[in-house]
Amino acid sequence: MIQLNYPLFDGEKLWEGACVSIENGVITSVEECDPAQCGDGMLLPGLIDAHVHMGSPGHVEAMLHSGITTVCDVSASRALIESSKQLEIIGSAGMAMGVVMNPKGYVEQAAENGAKYIKVLLFNALSIGKPALCGIVKAAHKRGLKVAVHATEIATVRQAVDAGADILLHVPMKEPFPAELADAIREKGIAVAPTLVMMETFAHSGRNGYKPEHYPNAQQAVRLLHRKGVPILAATDANPGTFAPAVGYGSTLHRELELLVDAGLTPLEVLSSATGNPAKAFGLHTGKLAAGMPANMLLVDGRPDRRITDSSKIQQIWVKGERIP
């Protein structure tokens, strides 16, 4: 049995002093203890990057050594997913895009290929069409799968919301986000992964007509959505640069956390965005330090609940109770 006494953020709330007991890779208890008997630093659940494009074992290593124990992926091969014994890769088995003639068939094929959720790419409001998108959502939900939709325009966000998507990936940048649309997102229980690190990169890339002056609209969207009570998910869109501006693996999640603080979330709320929030949004059995949960966690130097930059000061990482060297 392993016992650890530290200040702790459990994915939902803060403990100034907690004793965590671990046996056979599973947390058996989390109990309050005297902060004076705790070590320096803070325990956090293993971090979750809610939107990535994994392509190699090197990407897996970069994620793990940045304290990320779970990723929600679009691009990883089945072989990479199955060979990754420490980093949990929640895959979508590709994405729906363009013309989808048989929405139900697409979802069934993705599920057969190992999809744990369905990803839909909406370049614009005409790229898939309302009937096909609604069909994908209906078929996915019937199989118990969540649907995450890439939407970077107000029109595509509306389309995804109307279709009943569960998660929105990215936020529009070329125009301010409407308050009534944020209300609709909250009312439907949709979570949003703004990927600010990608939006910031796009804004300075000159690609797709983006300009640096567009980035404040992304920040405005996050502030508004957060104020309305929409769950925010930390996500980077980490990718090698083959289809979008490259965003690195692992360390960029900590940059994302900083950008979320800049956009108006508190450090404690941002920690939720990288742990409990994505676990709830994707229906994952991780992201929380509680009895019965896998002992995926990290010890950081400092207090990231007060200074979010401390999230990157990683001292130790555990996956299922085993320390990562």
Regions found by a protein language model. Give the residues of each.
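N-terminal metal-binding scaffold of metallo-dependent hydrolase/deaminase domains
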Residues: 1-33, 301-307, 322-323
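Divalent metal-coordination and catalytic microenvironments
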Residues: 6, 20, 25, 40, ...
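Divalent-metal coordination cores built from histidine and acidic residues
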Residues: 60-147, 152, 181, 187-205
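Glycine-enriched alpha-helix->loop->beta-strand junction motifs that scaffold or abut catalytic
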Residues: 114, 161-168, 186-191, 229-231
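Catalytic cores of alpha/beta
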Residues: 154-162
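His/Asp/Glu-enriched, well-ordered alpha-helical/loop segment
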Residues: 217-300
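C-terminal cap of metal-dependent C-N hydrolases
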Residues: 291-325
